[in-house]
């Protein structure tokens, strides 16, 4: 409440960038600048953008400028560490929000989740190309380890979620817990549960060298403030401590407190049924024919970016298209072709193979689709695909 700066939306990376800019200005005003000049901080906009995106900060105000200009800086490959990390991730040009958020970010975070967080710091700071390659390869390996740990815990958490919903289909929150669940991935697993079931979700783990106290991480849907709920539970003595913001929170509690916490949260969340229903509503920005999707259209859409928290990417709808060539790729992704009399469009539904969405797609019937347009390079050819968000039988 005491903050009147109007900069409460800044991520830590943005705060540091603004702070260093202010130091430069103050040194210049007071005649303290060295004879060879003050350091130019603009080349560090790539790190500022990366931190802003990976912290899921809202993309408005100065954050939007940081990300737009920072991605341009990142594409110049001035940071040997980021270039090495992009190479091990199989990225050509690191110039999009997707690359930063879903390719570079998870690998940088992997050290802190399942290894040594200083590996990422050393990678971003080094000017030595060989050292950068070695550190990037270590982070890539740790990220693969993180994904394996996450997958195992997600399977257990989903089983608990299914059992909880079978007992009470009307419950407004999912809580899963287990001994030995790695604290570095419980937040990711909570996010996966939220995406799958469209419910606020909390995942709790203990052990793993943390001692007897359990740690939990929560993710929420729009309109349901999970941080406030966790704070209230802490004040009432249901848990040891906790807090957060509207979309995410963390907590500490004794393992023996989990059942009481679960019951308290279910009772508390009952009041938000209307908000949860509203969160399921899907806004469609435009209707698109499969044959109208082109690299030029993707480029036009990109001009109003960057997209992220607080600046959603346009959602397109394909009406009454026929699904052909359905196949599972990777662990559980579904790739297919959507076509009508006027053309066809490649589509992919991420992590959908064992979901109701996947079932609709594998039936091979006519469907209505929604999703976001993406373009990538493959064998020297630029192609467009629809990243599918939802589907309904025609």
Question: What kind of region is each of these model predictions?
Answer:
Residues 1-15, 25, 37-40:
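Hydrophobic, small-residue-rich alpha-helical packing segments that form membrane-like cores
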Residues 25-257, 328:
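Hydrophobic helix-and-loop "lid/oligomerization" segment in the mid-to-C-terminal part
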Residues 131-135, 142-176, 210-212, 224, ...:
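Mid-to-C-terminal polyanion-binding domains and interfaces
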